[in-house]
Amino acid sequence: MGQQISDQTQLVLNKLPEKVAKHVMLVRESGSLTYEEFLGRVAELNDVTAKVASGQEKHLLFEVQPGSDSSAFWKVVVRVVCTKINKSSGIVEASRIMNLYQFIQLYKDITSQAAGVLAQSSTSEDADENSASVTSCQASLWMGRVKQLTDEEECCICMDGRADLILPCAHSFCQKCIDKWSDRHRNCPICRLQMTGANESWVVSDAPTEDDMANYILNMADEAGQPHRP
């Protein structure tokens, strides 16, 4: 029965637009991810990025933000800090914070890319030289991907409109989608967190300040070149 459901789900996913199908798969994966598996992926990213950027001037460090994983609802509030560090000086050049959904996207991107780079380096005698030229700025390239993931907030419902409304649970939506939903519901469409009071209703995120983002659990990272202060 389980396999049948899985096959049916795959058939449905095959008919969806690629972007929507990818979103559905990421949501399903984050929903089934255990805490131990999550920690394992954080450790794996540290190992993989260290191997690919071996011999390079900069490297990335991934770590769970202290205290963000202590809640029973850790999947909603957990944050992963990604830091770019200069190996020779030890200076933190950039730091950004990701939620679980963003981290899973980055995990898939990096592990997929790294597998190709490492496979190439193991099958070609000239790979060291070629790989060095390609990955000399690998940490910076990956940090750019982190910035892209944390900067581009899309509506969690339609995956098309830009998210301009944020709930206290950190899920974000476009005005059109959330207006339709809130006509009949008083909870988050994604995690079902109840909005109990009028002042807990949909929060406009127009030109948010750093304090605003912290208050709504966005936890966006510091701008490039500024160290993260936990």
Curated annotation (Swiss-Prot):
Subcellular location: Membrane
Topology in the lipid bilayer: Lipid-anchor
GO biological process: one example: regulation of DNA-templated transcription
Sorted UniProt keywords: Lipoprotein, Membrane, Metal-binding, Myristate, Zinc, Zinc-finger
Signal peptide: none
InterPro entries documented for this protein: RING-HC_RNF141, RNF141-like, Znf_RING, Znf_RING/FYVE/PHD, Znf_RING_CS
Presence of the UniProt keyword RNA-binding in the record: no
A family per Pfam: zf-RING_2
CDD domains: RING-HC_RNF141 (cd16545)
ZnF endpoints (RING-type): 155-192
Any Gene Ontology CC annotation: membrane
GO molecular function: ubiquitin-protein transferase activity; zinc ion binding
Lipid addition sites, N-myristoyl glycine: 2
Entry coiled-coil feature ranges: none
Domain of life according to the entry: Eukaryota
PANTHER family recorded: RING FINGER PROTEIN 141, RING FINGER PROTEIN 141-RELATED
Function: May be involved in spermatogenesis.
Name of protein: RING finger protein 141
Organism: Bos taurus (Bovine)
